[in-house]
Amino acid sequence: MTFPMEVWMNMLMIESCADAADTIAAGAAGSVEQFIIYMNDKAKELGLSETHVDNAIGLDIGNGYNEMYSTAEDIAKLAKEYMRIWVLADIVAKAEYTVPDCDVLAGRKLESTNYYLTKPELYHSDLFEVIGTKSGRTDAAGTCQVITAKDKDGRKLICCYFGGKSKDTIFKEMTGLLEYCYSNIK
């Protein structure tokens, strides 16, 4: 099955498709193993001093990958970096994406796991809008969400939440946190 990189990136960033992560890794670096080496070098280059990669999928110790770890601070730095790349910023702002048909599969619709994009009526705020997001879940980290938001003055904030018990809890607490921040920054 052959897709352009943009399709694989949409599959990875919108719905966290593990097969897309491995395909991107192998395609970009020649093998998943070489990609892991590249990602650890890139993490150092970006100043992500508390991050180590040992798989392309993003699974951690709770899922049997003992050398995969990061911190909220490093993830926020990474989010800031990927929001500078317009193709990635565009992808993480989508509520949905339709994977095109290919020679062996019919196309299918992917839906973002971000309630700010898929259920905006539940988590609307007059103080900010969400312009990018990535969610995930592992046994060790729990339910996680990274949000990039901006207010009417264009001020951007990146908010990371790890260890959530449920998506609803994360979105309620992140909305409160972002509203607090935007109400109090000058």
List each language-model region with its residue ranges.
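Membrane-embedded alpha-helical core segments of multi-pass
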Residues: 16-17, 74
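Penicillin-recognizing serine hydrolase domain
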Residues: 30-186
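Active-site-proximal loop and beta-strand segments within enzyme catalytic domains
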Residues: 1-11, 15, 21, 25-34, ...
